[in-house]
């Protein structure tokens, strides 16, 4: 789980009554997964070939990083001192809902580890160690170590994220988490251990935005795996019904779909087959 730290480590878990104030906060409107996002996360991930189409762009990067030949979902940063280096994804999104998973080991983040989105004009290199993603008006980033959101950082103050944190608290972001970009609503959000953390940025509609990260740790390796996307059309009733059935069963009981008194074709549909 993502962890919330004060004097000691506290685990963010809505099922734990010890953290009832936090539980109530996370159950508030801003922390409820949007319906379309909930549906997308229930869908099987896209094929590896599609993931490659949405992976890091080896032609759109700082010279101090490179996409690995043996795993093109991962990029590697050279151990260059006093340098902050970034890379964009291959695909810029203008419409639809898109979710990708970032895997970035906590021990490889260093002082400035930032994940977010950027236009094609955002810089991908800076001298020194800095919050490069979110540094100007061309990018939007979440600093994983500081729990701060940055956009146009030279002119605008950063904001706490997740927003429920108190001033003396720190949220420990685990090795893997999800990024959700909704270009129809114009929002960027993050999901940690299945918990929707709320909207991080708004006002993104009408832009063309690419996945981006900036890093300072030598030899760090960061993986991006595109999970799936949804077009902006209204959700089909059949898809909504399928989601309702799967929710009623729960993930641990999805295997029981085969025992339901339903036609084989409907069972296959419920199982995304």
UniProtKB/Swiss-Prot annotation:
Record-linked SMART domains: SOCS_box, SPRY
Span of domain SOCS box: 232-273
Pathway: Protein modification; protein ubiquitination
Keywords: Cytoplasm, Phosphoprotein, Ubl conjugation pathway
SUPFAM superfamilies: Concanavalin A-like lectins/glucanases
A matching Pfam family: SPRY
Annotated domain remarks: The SOCS box domain mediates the interaction with the Elongin BC complex, an adapter module in different E3 ubiquitin ligase complexes. Essential for its ability to link NOS2 and the ECS E3 ubiquitin ligase complex components ELOC and CUL5. The B30.2/SPRY domain is involved in MET and PAWR binding.
Assigned protein family: Belongs to the SPSB family.
Subunit composition and interactions: Component of the probable ECS(SPSB1) E3 ubiquitin-protein ligase complex which contains CUL5, RNF7/RBX2, Elongin BC complex and SPSB1. Interacts with CUL5, RNF7, ELOB and ELOC. Directly interacts with MET tyrosine kinase domain in the presence and in the absence of HGF, however HGF treatment has a positive effect on this interaction. When phosphorylated, interacts with RASA1 without affecting its stability. Interacts (via B30.2/SPRY domain) with PAWR; this interaction is direct and occurs in association with the Elongin BC complex. Interacts with NOS2. Interacts with EPHB2.
Record's protein name: SPRY domain-containing SOCS box protein 1
Originating organism: Homo sapiens (Human)
Name of encoding gene: SPSB1
């Amino acid at each position: 789980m993502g962890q919330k730290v004060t004097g000691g480590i506290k685990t963010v878990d809505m099922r734990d009554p010890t953290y009832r104030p936090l539980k109530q906060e996370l159950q508030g409107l801003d922390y409820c997964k949007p319906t379309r996002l909930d549906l997308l996360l229930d869908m099987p991930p896209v094929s590896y070939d599609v993931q490659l189409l949405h992976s890091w762009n080896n032609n759109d990067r700082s010279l101090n990083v490179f996409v690995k030949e043996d795993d093109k979902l991962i990029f590697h940063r050279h151990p260059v001192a006093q340098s902050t280096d970034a890379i964009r994804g291959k695909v810029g999104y203008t419409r639809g809902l898109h979710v990708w998973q970032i895997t970035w080991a906590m021990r490889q983040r260093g002082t400035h580890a930032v994940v977010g989105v950027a236009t094609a004009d955002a810089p991908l290199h800076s001298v020194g160690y800095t919050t490069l993603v979110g540094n100007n008006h061309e990018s939007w980033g979440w600093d994983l170590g500081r729990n701060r959101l940055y956009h146009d950082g030279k002119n605008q103050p950063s904001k706490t994220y997740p927003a429920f944190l108190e001033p003396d608290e720190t949220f420990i972001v685990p090795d893997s988490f999800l990024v959700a970009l909704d270009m129809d609503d114009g929002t960027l959000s993050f999901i940690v251990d299945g918990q929707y953390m709320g909207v991080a940025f708004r006002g993104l509609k009408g832009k063309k935005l690419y996945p981006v990260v900036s890093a300072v740790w030598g030899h760090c390796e960061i993986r991006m795996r595109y999970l799936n996307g949804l077009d902006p059309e209204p959700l089909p009733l059949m898809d909504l019904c399928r989601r309702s059935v799967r929710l009623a069963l729960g993930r641990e009981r999805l295997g029981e779909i085969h025992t339901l008194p339903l036609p084989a074709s409907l069972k296959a549909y419920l199982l995304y087959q």
